[in-house]
Swiss-Prot record:
Enzyme class: translocase
Gene behind the chain: nuoK
UniProt-listed Enzyme Commission number(s): 7.1.1.-
Keyword Oxidoreductase assigned: no
Name of this chain's protein: NADH-quinone oxidoreductase subunit K
Origin superkingdom: Bacteria
InterPro entries from the UniProt entry: NADH_UbQ_OxRdtase_chain4L/K, NUOK/Mnh_C1-like
Organism of origin: Chloroflexus aggregans (strain MD-66 / DSM 9485)
Subcellular location: Cell membrane
Catalytic activity: a quinone + NADH + 5 H(+)(in) = a quinol + NAD(+) + 4 H(+)(out)
GO molecular function: NADH:ubiquinone reductase (non-electrogenic) activity; quinone binding
Length: 100
C-alpha cells in the first residue's frame, strides 16, 4: 500500500507546476490547462486524505469539485474560442477585452 505522504507530495508537485504555468506562460490555453492542473492536484490531495481519515464525505466533495471543474472547462473554452475568433490570438498580453 502506498503511503499518503507520496500522494501529497505528488499533489504538491502538480500544484507547483500549475502555478508556474499560470505565472510564466502567456498563452491563454496553457494558462487554462495550468488552472485545471491545480484543481486536479487539490483533488488528489483531498482524496489521499479521505482515503486515510475522512471517508465518504471528502469523496463527495471531490465529486462536486470535479463537476465544477467540468463546468469551468465548458465556460472557459467557450470564452477562449470567442476571444480567438475576434482577436485572432491566444496571447493574453495581446488581448485586452476591456479596451474598446
Amino acid at each position: 500500500m502506498v503511503p499518503t505522504s507520496y500522494y501529497v507530495l505528488l499533489s504538491a508537485i502538480l500544484f507547483t507546476i500549475g502555478v508556474l504555468g499560470v505565472l510564466l506562460r502567456r498563452n491563454a490555453i496553457v494558462i487554462f490547462m495550468s488552472v485545471e492542473l491545480m484543481l486536479n492536484a487539490a483533488n488528489l490531495a483531498l482524496v489521499a486524505f479521505a482515503r486515510e481519515r475522512l471517508g465518504v464525505e471528502a469523496q463527495a466533495i471531490v465529486f462536486f469539485v470535479i463537476t465544477v471543474a467540468a463546468a469551468e472547462v465548458a465556460v472557459g473554452l467557450a470564452l477562449l474560442v470567442s476571444i480567438f475568433r475576434t482577436k485572432r490570438t491566444a496571447d493574453v498580453d495581446e488581448v485586452s477585452t476591456l479596451k474598446g
